[in-house]
Amino acid sequence: MPTINRIRIVNIFYDGRIIKDSIFDYYGGRNALMNLNNGGGKTVMIETIFQPIIPGMDIDGWKITDYLTGDQKPSYVMIEWMLDGTKKPSYFMTGICLSKTNVRGDDDKNIKVLKYFTFVHDYDQGNEFDIKNINVSEERDGKNVFY
């Protein structure tokens, strides 16, 4: 069974905090533990990590659109799976690019609409499109610019 090797989260906001661009390394698919205080972001992390697998999934009424900016800046979530049954290490990355748009409903209230596309990449060694190197943002004039 494939195991999660690394997870990359880009541009997720919650409780006044931001995950700008972080890679969580699970060192060859070993078990992982998130030990955070209440309000530390465990639910946000789990909900975010599930997005490439079940886009739009929510937990206990918290919607992924609550963690996205409304200014058309995309967020990315990527999971690198270590495949089993291969002679040399082999990886499969599943990813999603998320953004939200505010749409005016019939009752003149704004409705948060999730927009996304998914992508995949398989590889057996590091390359320009692996989870670490795929270019989804850069810093220009002290600000992050997202693609």
Language model features: what each stretch is:
Residues 1-145:
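Extreme N-terminal "head/tail" segments of very large remodeling/mechanoenzyme assemblies
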